[in-house]
Amino acid sequence: MNINPINLIPANELGKDSKIKLSVCDTEHDLYWRMAIEVLETIKANNEKGEDTIMVVPYGPLGPYSRLVYLVNTYRVSLKRCTFINMDEYLNDDCTYIDKNDPLSFRGGMERIFYNLVDDELNVLPENRHFPVPGEEHKVMELIEKAGKLDMAWGGVGINGHFAFNEPPEPGESCTAEEFLNRPTRVLPISRETKTINCFMNCGGDLEAIPKYCITVGMKEMFMAKKIRMCMPRDWNAGALRKILHGGETPAVPCSLFARHPDAMIYCSRVATESPVPEIRIYNK
């Protein structure tokens, strides 16, 4: 059996000598609290300075949002000066948005899990809730340039190491790290790996239920953020975690390129630090 040496690194040595910081949380729930608290603290600090907050945010993982709602409503932290740019959305075959009422829609999902639950007097103003729009991809950069900053980009990491839907180059596709990091907000096909894990997580394994296309905020815009925060809460994140931290900088594992960012950190659960050495796993023993 050919085992990648990085998969043999003991869990307590992960992140050593990596330019990307690692914060290991005991459980998935602890991770969600830490992420929510950092988002809240960033907003609160800007509020106290009389400054606006602008973030690129995900739809997933969902866990931080319920905790952020609780923190905002309990401690009365205003989001009125926030601009949230969601990082991606699914598209139809004609590269238009899927219906907002589709269970898979991130636009509809953000309303259900976050915007509809924050107290009105504290909520992000409707005009400051953004998604990248097919045909108007340039507007994401315009929002960031108008704000003069991007406080944070945070979100989950895909099974192939992607961030948002910044998918790795396809086999045989030539792309340098510099070229990949210069890719802006755009429409693109969803990779087979992403379709597979997303249908496993959300559609009972029905591959055909996952759309073929998406729109994503690009790595070009992500790198403008003061802080990059990646969330890896699941056991299936274990392989990508090690590649990101110890596999070298490569577009084949997009998040590995955040080693070039001055403030990039991964929040992971302890289960994600386990070695991904192959074994036959028996579920529901």
Predicted regions and their residues:
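A short secondary-structure junction signal
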Residues: 141-142, 163-177, 240-244, 278-279
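Gly/Ser/Thr-rich loops at beta-strand to alpha-helix junctions
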Residues: 55-64, 159-162, 235-237
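ATP/nucleoside-binding phosphotransfer catalytic cores, i.e., glycine-rich phosphate-binding loops
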Residues: 2, 9, 19, 25-26, ...
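Glycine-rich N-terminal segment of FAD-binding domains in flavoprotein oxidoreductases
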Residues: 44-76
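Class I SAM-dependent methyltransferase SAM-binding "motif I" and its flanking Rossmann-like core
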Residues: 164-211, 215
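A glycine- and small-aliphatic-rich helix-loop capping segment at beta-alpha/alpha-beta transitions
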Residues: 68-78, 101-102, 168-177, 247
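Nucleotide donor/acceptor-binding cores
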Residues: 51-53, 80-82, 226
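Ligand-binding beta-strand-loop-alpha-helix segment within the catalytic cores
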Residues: 4-23, 29-32, 77-154, 209
